[in-house]
């Protein structure tokens, strides 16, 4: 790789950040991390998994204390509810409330369904390659920082 290509890769990352900023505005007090958490919880439930904070943390590759804080905020705002396991009182499961389901429907399902036809010029292979490259680049930059 050349220095110029590294610069172009960083420029592409900036464009990706700008594309994220073009997502629809969220309601007051709702962060993008709420939307990600709702999405992960629903995906895990679809796979037959009763989601826990540790599942969110592992899936999103985020530290548990931050995820715990976000879950508490979401519960306080009425998007999630927690339920202690009947079998093991140390385990707490996460469930979307009606408000959480509506929020996820609007900002996950509906928005991305509307966006889908505009992206048909990007092949699944190109998208997968971009994702893989950005993940590798992020890992390299993170390791270099440590």
Please provide the spans of the model-predicted regions:
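Alpha-solenoid HEAT/Armadillo repeat architecture
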Residues: 46, 61, 101, 105, ...
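N-terminal helix-turn-helix DNA-binding core of bacterial DNA-binding proteins
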Residues: 21-63
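N-terminal leader segment of winged-helix/HTH proteins
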Residues: 1-32
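Canonical helix-turn-helix DNA-binding module
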Residues: 49-92
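Basic, amphipathic "hinge/linker" alpha-helix immediately C-terminal to the N-terminal HTH DNA-binding motif
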Residues: 86-107
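N-terminal positioning helix adjacent to the helix-turn-helix/winged-helix DNA-binding module
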Residues: 5, 33-37, 52, 99, ...
């Amino acid at each position: 790789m050349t220095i110029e290509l590294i610069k172009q890769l960083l420029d592409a990352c900036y464009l990706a950040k700008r594309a994220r900023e073009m997502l629809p505005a969220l309601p007051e007090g709702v962060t993008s991390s709420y939307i990600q958490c709702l999405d992960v919880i629903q995906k895990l439930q679809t796979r037959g998994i009763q989601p826990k904070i540790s599942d969110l943390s592992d899936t999103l590759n985020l530290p548990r204390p931050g995820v715990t804080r976000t879950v508490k905020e979401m519960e306080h705002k009425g998007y999630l509810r927690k339920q202690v396991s009947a079998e093991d009182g140390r385990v707490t499961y996460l469930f979307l409330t009606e408000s959480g389901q509506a929020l996820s429907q609007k900002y996950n399902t509906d928005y991305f369904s509307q966006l889908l036809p505009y992206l048909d010029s990007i092949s699944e292979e190109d998208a997968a390659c971009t994702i893989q490259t950005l993940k590798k680049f992020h890992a390299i930059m993170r390791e270099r920082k440590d």
